[in-house]
Amino acid sequence: GIFEGQNHTISGLYFKQENTSEVGFFGYNGGKISNVGILNSYFCGFSRVGGVCGYNSSTITNCYNKGVVDGTADAAGSFGGVCGCNLGILTNCYNTGIVKGQLFVGGVSGDNIKTITNCYNTGIVSGQSYVGGIDGDNSGTITNCNNEGKVSGTEDYVGGVSGDNNKTITNCYNTGIVSGQSYVGGVNGYNQNGTIINCNTTGEVNGTGSHVGGVIGMNLSKGTITNCYYDSTVYTGAAIGDDMGTTEKVEGKTIEQYKTGEVAYLLQLDQSDEVWGQ
């Protein structure tokens, strides 16, 4: 089916079912949801909880959440501001609300298996492990997205864009504070078999354990990171906490290099569409 919101907003929803999965304005979407905003609402469940949709297998476009997404203490996972678990396409969506849970927690999507494009988060995102400003656990593609919200995990796999990455992150950036225990990075906490290209972070990175980096916490042997930068004035440690994979042009830049436009130039280099600007 098709839900066309016509730029209207939905306000005052309250749903708290601690043993329920697929919770949101729509619990499950197999059609098309577009042009709707969720305000002053609260969604709490066991797994797959999102402000707009709990579980998406199709398309969500031009939607946003300004409500609270919450997971119970013994929750299974997949909590996102827009969508809890995404097996479809999220485009031009954003979250400004609080998102909290245990595992797989993200500002836009908790668990992304397909596509997130042109989305952003400014809300506070917190969880235990697999926590990210855009997505908690990525095995799909994340493109042209940015996080400005505070991201925190009490344990591991925490990143400004994605906590854990197994596929592709391109043209994304983070300006929010990122905090966790181990495997913590300004862009991504744990890059397993994924590719991260043309990404940038200027937010603080704080890790109390091991494998902490300005860009990536840990890059495994099958991981690839290319043309990614971080503000070395804000975070004075290494770009990658532990690098076992393939890297090229992954380094810190000073605030002066950001101000002159050098970093924007490097990120835009060789791209036909204008993505990065000063």
Predicted features and spans:
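Predominantly extracellular beta-rich ligand-binding scaffolds that present long acidic/polar faces
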Residues: 1-278
